[in-house]
């Protein structure tokens, strides 16, 4: 069984004439690219390992040169490709923090054990994250990701227990 691959960026364009690509980082840790030696490129069903030669940053983009990509013509064919890494290469998070992709898809229950729905998305509001919980009936419940509300996150069971503030369900 192969280890799960995690999406960290998408190639949006070429950069210059030497085969570099412009990557939109899909991570809170764009500095991670400097530490990586290789990444997996995925385009549809095709996946291949490429080795990182150079890394630089321009505005909100990461500029990468791959050893296997010799020129701009080869780089042009990579537009839209996703960059992925093994889960074991993730930046470790402090205790009590979780990656969004680990939260999405988790079942949410209140403190009494009543099923509320499944986390469909996590909104970044600045002050705190908000879990978008979709019920079986299709209704959405916005649950603030606060310690006073989210009492337990069990990633192994993909289960989150919450204590909803008064009036949040209405």
Swiss-Prot record:
A molecular-function term among this protein's GO annotations: ribosome binding
Annotated GO CC locations: cytoplasm; ribosome
Pfam families found in the cross-reference section: PRC_RimM, RimM
InterPro entries for this protein: PRC_barrel-like_sf, PRC_RimM, RimM, RimM_N, RimM_N_sf, Transl_B-barrel_sf
All copies of domain PRC barrel, residue ranges: 94-168
A GO biological process held by the record: rRNA processing
Family from the record: Belongs to the RimM family.
Quaternary context: Binds ribosomal protein uS19.
Free-text comment about domains: The PRC barrel domain binds ribosomal protein uS19.
Name of the protein in its database record: Ribosome maturation factor RimM
Species assigned in the record: Desulforudis audaxviator (strain MP104C)
Organism placement in taxonomy: Bacteria, Bacillati, Bacillota, Clostridia, Thermoanaerobacterales
